Amino acid sequence: MSASPKGFRFATVSAGFRKEARPDLALIVSDTPATAAGVFTTNRFQAAPVVVARENLSARPVARAVVINSGQANACTGDEGMTNCRTTLDLVGKACGIPAAEVLPASTGVIGAQLHMDKWREAAPRLAAALGQNTHHDFARAIMTTDAFPKVAERELAIAGTTVRLVGMAKGAGMICPNMATMLSVVLCDAAVTPEAWQRLFLDAVDRTFNRVTVDGDTSTNDTVFGLANGASGVTVEGEDLAKLGEALTDVLARLAYMLVQDGEGATKVMRVKVSGAVDDAEAEAVARTVGHSQLVKTAMYGRDANWGRIVAAVGRSGASFKAEDVVVTLCGVELFRNGQPTDLDFDTLLREPLKGRDVTVDIELGAGTGHYELLASDLTHDYVNCNADYRS
Amino acid sequence: MSASPKGFRFATVSAGFRKEARPDLALIVSDTPATAAGVFTTNRFQAAPVVVARENLSARPVARAVVINSGQANACTGDEGMTNCRTTLDLVGKACGIPAAEVLPASTGVIGAQLHMDKWREAAPRLAAALGQNTHHDFARAIMTTDAFPKVAERELAIAGTTVRLVGMAKGAGMICPNMATMLSVVLCDAAVTPEAWQRLFLDAVDRTFNRVTVDGDTSTNDTVFGLANGASGVTVEGEDLAKLGEALTDVLARLAYMLVQDGEGATKVMRVKVSGAVDDAEAEAVARTVGHSQLVKTAMYGRDANWGRIVAAVGRSGASFKAEDVVVTLCGVELFRNGQPTDLDFDTLLREPLKGRDVTVDIELGAGTGHYELLASDLTHDYVNCNADYRS
């Protein structure tokens, strides 16, 4: 296990937001102000912590701390929810000696209920006192909801002869039964980067990774990704080295994104949908999303069924432009469809073993241009329905 | 049971396209040339019968016959599939003494395999000989695939003191395991209507009905709706009476569309998503489709779960314009969400009984304009996954 980036301390405590007794409040503090960036849900209903974090970052792209609670989403909670969110930042900031405006909040859990402020008041001093006693692995564990495993990715790179470290923690595309998916992630880096450069690298990395995974297409009111770079390694990254840092950042987020799909509710497969030859990237994305969201394709993958017809039908209704006879569909390296017809390969036999694995690749070549896109998607399983159809009758 | 429209005869035979011995080839013949219209799948991969039927109708909007086979879709079959389709029309036309150009084909079943032409040659004379020995109920039964029940809707109306009859037959949004959904429908009318007027009434009725139902969002290579009006009642419908006929036609198709959702694979619910107050109808449609396609909403309905959060989240990611605090969500008449927050009603108790029923209404008021849209959607159930995840390993 590689070390965590320098200059960040972690704390987790059980505040009692959840029914079971387990850490449900997690804090990261940077010893010095860190360059900070955030990407948030595009849902029109935005949770209070999303609104507050966005405000803090747009006022000044600098942060000293990130505080995340699980168990309560503080979404659809009106003005009281906004006030409560700001109060939690005051409580945590005061306990740690940090301005509230430099604390970034995120929440995940049941929506529509107000935060238990008494529990926050009780927990904040304990949280501050615990700083340095926990690791980023503890942090990843404390933000879990229905996740089957904590999600951590680490990376080191050498810049100007010195080691720069990155670590990312995430919680899952596994939904919060009985509410909705919330994806939260924090990535930390001990390089010094200008706010403009960090923002650019961060948005680009998120776009190439988290924005290209799907479990069920539902996005939550709380989805949040934060990136903090505090300079504690003593290395300033600029000029040509920025590309190296961007590559490492993308790698960390890509590994977390893969884990999100792997741990999607009830998922048994990680389907990699690779579309090429589209008129442009946007049409390639439309094809990838139509295939990756198709209930029929997702159940076929669960059923280990080399069902080219469902893939072809999804491609055909995606709205993308192409000639039917130019499309080639390949599943796990076996060509299923070409010249408007299934190939004459015995693909049921050829694919029996490959489709038993966790990773399934669907290559779709449209023959209409150079646009391409890649999406990771989960399958649709009995356990997905079990988890989400919680009979109350 | 009301009578069938005058001047149409029906025949069904077992041609052997399916594994089990049952009628799988069905024919309608009109005694006189009928004004004909068709609506077809928008999927870019179009089955041979879709291409041929479209050609026949665009050459001349008149038909004497409709022939439908189940068991083989004749989709993704290349040039040979096109030739075979035209040959089937020759065979049926010759057997019935009708020009092949006035026979409209549709097919449903396994895709990617060529039609069994020997079976068509053997069956065509038997089919012609059986004309008049079967009813429209037999027709509806012969075109079934995985449908749980045949789908028929009838309607009479008086125009100028004379009875005009309509009958519609459909097969289902239940998928053809292990391939894809195919929806086929034929509506017959014994009024005389000009091609222009019939086309307009028919497209409008399809748009208000079949285009507003969804089981899983997947559309097939073969989806087809035909409408034939043969004038055998002796009544010519024109002028103000056209609105009456249009209303009756829409009613017939609406009842069939409801049955398609009711019989969606594994479905236990028919969810009526009614969106109002959108900026325009297109945004209302986007909201209705996002909610109706949401796996989380669909599993919640299956689970009889008054889960306002999932509905709100789907509304929020639909892309429609509105203020979060203006949205009102009502489930089976019980207001769940208003002013950006859940209402304080005890909706779990209030909705326990209503959510046990088959029909569930979701009203979504956006408060942003006058746009509205209504969509019928099925739920997502264990049986859906059972039916579509056919383990081959």
Swiss-Prot record, chains A, B:
Pathway: Amino-acid biosynthesis; L-arginine biosynthesis; L-ornithine and N-acetyl-L-glutamate from L-glutamate and N(2)-acetyl-L-ornithine (cyclic): step 1/1; Amino-acid biosynthesis; L-arginine biosynthesis; N(2)-acetyl-L-ornithine from L-glutamate: step 1/4
Biological classification of the source: Bacteria, Pseudomonadati, Thermodesulfobacteriota, Desulfovibrionia, Desulfovibrionales
Residues carrying the site annotation Cleavage: A181, T182
Gene designation per UniProt: argJ
Annotated catalysed reactions: N(2)-acetyl-L-ornithine + L-glutamate = N-acetyl-L-glutamate + L-ornithine; L-glutamate + acetyl-CoA = N-acetyl-L-glutamate + CoA + H(+)
Name used for this protein in its record: Arginine biosynthesis bifunctional protein ArgJ
Gene3D superfamilies membership: ArgJ beta chain, C-terminal domain, L-amino peptidase D-ALA esterase/amidase
Subunit architecture: Heterotetramer of two alpha and two beta chains.
UniProt: substrate binding residues: T145, K171, T182, E265, N388, S393
Source organism of the structure: Nitratidesulfovibrio vulgaris (strain ATCC 29579 / DSM 644 / CCUG 34227 / NCIMB 8303 / VKM B-1760 / Hildenborough) (Desulfovibrio vulgaris)
